[in-house]
Amino acid sequence: MRLKKIRNYLDKQGWKYSYTEEEGLGSIDFEHRGLSYHIWDFEDGGYGAETNVRTVGRQEDILGDYEEEIIEILKTW
């Protein structure tokens, strides 16, 4: 199971989400205040995540400690 820290955060907030895993990589889709969000982790010489949590209309890649960075963004909501 991937994206465990993010899934734990979403569970604590009581936010419903769908989680899928393919080829060992995780994907989370959820809605918040009527907007759809996506977090997809990838491996390309290192792990990262593609997400639209910072700017709902635009995808961005987050590298390094991407789960913590995404959680910090979610905390600002």
Regions found by a protein language model. Name each.
Residues 36-53:
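Short, conserved beta-strand/beta-arch hydrophobic-aromatic motifs that form part
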Residues 1-32, 50-68, 72-77:
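Negatively charged, low-complexity tracts enriched in Asp/Glu with abundant Ser/Thr
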